[in-house]
């Protein structure tokens, strides 16, 4: 990620400020300088806040970023443009605030844009989703951004001096190693669940085994005494247990079947005796009821005589009733005939009146026919009357337009001829322009090659001079080194080792006496005097140390010079002097000017010709359009004339209005005549139809009357014949019989009921006599006692069998469940063994006591340290190397860092370093961390880094080394920005971003020293 432009509004001390990072050429190193509190670190805060909504340091909250001098109605916002993977993005973040005069907070806003074809297009417009978009785009979150892009004040050396637990948190964030801890937790939970399931399965097996029914059987009890943990023994005993249970069930079933058969015998015997007893009682009762029924026989015979007489008189009564109905019909027919005759007379009168109206209408027939003829002939004109009326209105306008269009067309033709004369034989020559452009490009390339070669030669001479100077220094230092090594070899180092043993020799002398045996060599001690000059030895040792220190310093200088020569050689190898033209710059510039003038002249000529051609095409198009309009005008004018002629010929009118008035009047008269004529015809037809209907009705009524009279005569004859057959003389006899008809239904029901009961008694008595014949009735009480005894015994055995059967089936189900649990348990133990082992390994139960996450973090830390040591060796003059401490720290292994001093060949705690040495180590470690994260993250583009930390703790030489390290970062294509108050940096770094403060707000500007 490379910053391009930063705009701040009401952010920290910046009320309205813009910083253009595009002024930084070729990713050069630049310094951010200013007084304390001017807002230098706020620039880093602004970039971090724009991307992630957080400051560059964790201690600063979002509310602390808003300027105290900001307008209460204006929001705090940051707009940040940056380049990533050759694509340009812009983010605009507005912080939440309570607007002056409001009580509710205005929410935060965040927009993400991407430049496409020179314009910004929005990608996200919500705070949460936009921030997530930036995290996915950059490949880092805010914490990782602080470690990789911005090394903030106070946090620069945090990673170096932190303990293992703190480093674990930092590395976990940078390398996303929480997934390995999550794997450990998942495996731990999985093992916990599996162990719980296994224990639960053992408990289920034990519970099922304890619930198996023994039936108080010694064999089963013996089988159940096996412990449930002995699952193999359980598998052996289960078939034996099931077999013994089946034997017990079979024995109980046999007793049950015997009891059921005995009960069925006594049950059948009891049922048959009860049925016989009921049949005898029923037979006696039916015989008594049958005798009582026979006593009603005389009454039933009288009822049957009355019913027979009622049946015989039925026909006579029907004839009498029919006579009354026929007489009523005859009277109604006579009334209908009279009404119909009156209706026919009224219809004849109405027809005579309508005939008079029809005759008067026919007298106007000739006049109507002439109007119909006119309407038919001119109907087509009236239907399109607007067309003809418009023709009268348009004809004069079209004549005027035609004349005007003709004049305009002639003017355009004359203009076209003038343009064609101007063009003449001239033609556009674009090939010549291409040829001139190519020539100019080639000349520019030759000029650039000459300039680049001159610049490269100057740079080469400078580098060769630097290389020669470095080689001379190396030769001089090599000569001095050889002299020092020769001087060092002259010392006898074997005689200098006693200096370290001075206290040891003194202790031995104090513990022995003359004449004792020496504890070192075993000889007799002759003298305890001083035989060793320790002062002389110490002096020579100091001289040797001084020589060795000088040798080491010279070797370091030689190594540095060799490194510088290597760097110079790389620059020399990168210098490329190209083949250049034989012409001088003056000649090439003159040729360039001539070709550029020729190119401009040809472009002007082409432009003039194209303008003339464009004007010609425009005039041609106008002529064509005018001709089309003129043709259209003539066509419309001819059409108007034809329509007017057609109208006047057919209508004999020369005025549209008069024609319309007469036509509508004729149509109205014809319609009125036709409607009235149709109305009269409809009335005549209706009268004719109504008269025909009434005539048919009259004939129908007369025929009905004749039929009714004939029916009445026949009915009278039938009445006389029936009275003669029944020996009835007058109507009084008939009335008496008719009085019985009200009781007929009751009499018939009484007779039918008697006959039905009589028949039922006969059938039932015969049936019961057949069922009780030759059968003996037993003692019911004895049978009942025996029945209850057998039933109780049977029920007891059925219940016992049901219980035993249920318990046997339950035992089978439980043993099957036990077998299933055992099989599943064995398979589960087999399958989960590897998971148990894996869980122990990743949880730290291994030979190194390392969890999986710590193992991964140690791998990354080793890579970071290796990368950091490449720079630390240069910055510390090959004295210090960072190493990882192997000892356990606070329960975490190997995440703390020590420093190894090559001068003393010993490792020591990082806190023993001076302020400058700590800065060197922190810078090397931070840069190593940055590079390793970039390698591992796959896609993070680290094209810039900003450092806000103490260069003031460094001496002059160390400061130079640190600057060289940062300059090397520039050569890798990374922009490097530094915040510092060190005045030496202002002299060494040519580009400075100066931050000035006027007490309440700050401003920035780039300047060069």
UniProtKB/Swiss-Prot annotation:
Function: SbcCD cleaves DNA hairpin structures. These structures can inhibit DNA replication and are intermediates in certain DNA recombination reactions. The complex acts as a 3'->5' double strand exonuclease that can open hairpins. It also has a 5' single-strand endonuclease activity. Is probably part of the SOS regulon and involved in DNA recombination and repair.
InterPro entries given in the database record: P-loop_NTPase, Rad50/SbcC_AAA, SbcCD_Nuclease_C
Record keywords, A-Z: ATP-binding, Coiled coil, DNA damage, DNA recombination, DNA repair, DNA replication, Endonuclease, Exonuclease, Hydrolase, Nuclease, Nucleotide-binding, SOS response
An individual GO BP term: SOS response
Induction remarks: Induced by ciprofloxacin and up-regulated by LexA.
Gene symbol of the encoding locus: sbcC
Keyword Ligase attached: no
First and last residue of the signal peptide: none
Assembly mode: Heterodimer of SbcC and SbcD.
One Gene Ontology term of the molecular function aspect: ATP binding
Similarity comment: Belongs to the SMC family. SbcC subfamily.
Source organism (scientific name): Staphylococcus aureus (strain NCTC 8325 / PS 47)
Taxonomic classification: Bacteria, Bacillati, Bacillota, Bacilli, Bacillales
The protein, known as: Nuclease SbcCD subunit C
One Pfam match: AAA_23
Gene3D superfamilies hit by this protein: Helix hairpin bin (1.10.287.510), P-loop containing nucleotide triphosphate hydrolases (3.40.50.300)
GO cellular component: DNA repair complex
């Amino acid at each position: 990620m490379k910053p391009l432009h930063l705009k701040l509004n009401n952010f920290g001390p910046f009320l309205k400020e813009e910083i253009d990072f595009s002024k930084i050429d070729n990713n050069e190193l630049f310094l951010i300088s200013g007084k304390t509190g001017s807002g230098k670190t706020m620039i880093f805060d602004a970039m971090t806040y724009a991307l992630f909504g957080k400051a560059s340091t964790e201690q600063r909250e979002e509310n602390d970023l808003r300027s105290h001098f900001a307008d209460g109605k204006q929001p705090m916002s940051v707009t940040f443009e940056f380049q990533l993977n050759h694509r340009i993005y812009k983010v605009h973040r507005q912080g939440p605030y309570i607007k002056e005069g409001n009580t509710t907070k205005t929410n935060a806003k965040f927009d993400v844009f991407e430049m496409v074809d020179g314009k910004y297009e929005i990608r996200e417009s919500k705070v949460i989703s936009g921030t997530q978009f930036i995290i996915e785009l950059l490949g880092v979150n805010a914490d990782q951004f602080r470690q990789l892009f911005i090394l903030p004040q106070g946090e620069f050396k945090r990673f170096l001096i932190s303990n293992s637990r703190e480093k674990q948190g930092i590395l976990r964030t940078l390398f996303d190693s929480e997934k390995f801890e999550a794997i450990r937790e998942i495996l731990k939970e999985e093992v916990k669940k599996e162990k719980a399931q296994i224990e639960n399965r053992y408990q289920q097996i034990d519970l099922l085994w304890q619930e198996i029914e023994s039936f108080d059987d010694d064999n089963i009890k013996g089988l159940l005494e096996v412990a449930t943990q002995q699952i193999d023994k359980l598998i052996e005993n289960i078939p034996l247990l099931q077999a013994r249970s089946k034997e017990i069930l079979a024995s109980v079933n046999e007793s049950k079947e015997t009891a059921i058969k005995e009960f069925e015998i006594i049950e059948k015997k009891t049922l048959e005796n009860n049925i016989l007893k009921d049949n005898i009682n029923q037979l006696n009762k039916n015989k008594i009821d049958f005798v009582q029924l026979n006593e009603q026989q005389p009454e039933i015979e009288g009822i049957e005589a009355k019913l027979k007489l009622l049946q015989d008189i039925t026909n006579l009564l029907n004839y009498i009733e029919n006579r009354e109905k026929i007489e009523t019909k005859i009277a109604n027919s006579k009334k209908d005939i009279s009404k119909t005759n009156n209706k026919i007379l009224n219809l004849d009168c109405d027809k005579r009146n309508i005939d008079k109206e029809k005759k008067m209408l026919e007298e106007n027939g000739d006049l109507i026919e002439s109007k119909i003829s006119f309407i038919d002939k001119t109907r087509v004109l009236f239907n399109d009357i607007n067309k003809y009326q418009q023709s009268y209105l348009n004809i004069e306008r079209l004549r005027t337009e035609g004349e005007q269009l003709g004049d305009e067309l002639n003017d355009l033709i004359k203009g076209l001829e003038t343009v064609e004369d101007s063009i003449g034989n001239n033609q556009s020559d674009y090939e010549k322009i291409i040829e001139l452009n190519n020539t100019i490009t080639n000349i520019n390339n030759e000029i650039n090659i000459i300039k680049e070669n001159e610049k490269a030669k100057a740079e080469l001479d400078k580098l060769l001079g630097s290389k020669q100077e470095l080689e001379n220094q190396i030769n001089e230092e090599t000569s001095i080194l050889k002299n020092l090594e020769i001087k060092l070899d002259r010392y006898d180092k074997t005689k200098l080792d006693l200096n370290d043993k001075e206290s040891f020799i003194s202790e031995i002398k104090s513990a022995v006496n003359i004449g004792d045996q020496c504890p070192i060599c075993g000889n007799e001690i002759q003298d305890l005097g001083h035989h060793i000059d320790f002062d002389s030895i110490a002096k020579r040792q100091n001289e040797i140390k001084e020589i060795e220190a000088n040798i080491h310093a010279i070797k370091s200088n030689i190594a540095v010079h060799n490194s510088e020569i290597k760097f110079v050689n790389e620059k020399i190898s990168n210098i490329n002097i190209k083949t250049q033209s034989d012409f001088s710059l003056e000649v090439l510039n003159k040729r360039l000017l001539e070709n550029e003038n020729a190119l401009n002249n040809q472009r002007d000529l082409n432009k003039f010709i194209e303008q003339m051609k464009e004007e010609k095409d425009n005039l041609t198009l106008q002529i064509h359009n005018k001709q089309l309009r003129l043709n259209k005008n003539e066509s419309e004018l001819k059409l108007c004339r034809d329509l007017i002629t057609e109208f006047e010929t057919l209508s004999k009118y020369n005025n549209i209005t008069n024609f319309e008035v007469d036509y509508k009047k004729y149509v109205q008269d014809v319609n009125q005549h036709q409607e009235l004529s149709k109305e009269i015809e409809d009335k005549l037809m209706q009268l004719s139809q109504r008269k025909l209907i009434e005539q048919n009705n009259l004939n129908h009524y007369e025929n009905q009357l004749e039929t009714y009279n004939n029916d009445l005569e026949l009915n009278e004859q039938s009445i006389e014949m029936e009275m003669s057959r029944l020996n009835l003389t007058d109507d009084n006899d008939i009335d008496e019989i008719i009085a019985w008809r009200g009781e007929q239904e009751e009499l018939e029901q009484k007779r039918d009921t008697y006959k039905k009961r009589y028949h039922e008694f006969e059938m039932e008595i015969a049936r019961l006599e057949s069922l009780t014949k030759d059968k003996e009735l037993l003692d019911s009480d004895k049978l009942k006692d025996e029945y209850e005894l057998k039933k109780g015994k049977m029920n007891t055995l059925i219940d016992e069998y049901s219980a035993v059967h249920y318990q046997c089936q339950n035992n089978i189900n439980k043993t099957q469940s036990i077998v299933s649990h055992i099989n599943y348990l064995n398979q589960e133990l087999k399958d989960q063994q590897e998971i148990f082992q894996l869980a122990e390994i990743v949880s730290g139960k291994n030979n190194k006591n390392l969890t999986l996450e710590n193992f991964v973090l140690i791998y990354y830390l080793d890579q970071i340290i290796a990368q950091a040591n490449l720079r630390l060796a240069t910055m510390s003059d090959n004295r210090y190397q960072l190493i990882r401490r192997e000892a356990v720290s606070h329960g975490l292994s190997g995440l703390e860092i020590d420093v190894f001093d090559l001068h003393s060949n010993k490792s020591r705690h990082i806190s023993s370093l001076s302020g400058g040495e700590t800065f060197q180590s922190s810078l090397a470690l931070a840069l190593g961390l940055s590079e390793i994260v970039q390698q591992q993250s796959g896609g993070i583009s680290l094209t810039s880094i900003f450092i806000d930390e103490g260069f003031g703790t460094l001496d002059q030489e160390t400061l130079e080394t640190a600057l060289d390290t940062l300059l090397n970062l520039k050569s890798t294509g990374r922009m490097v920005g530094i915040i510092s108050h060190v005045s030496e940096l202002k002299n060494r770094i040519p580009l400075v971003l100066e931050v000035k403060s006027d007490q309440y707000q700050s401003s920035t500007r780039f300047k060069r020293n």
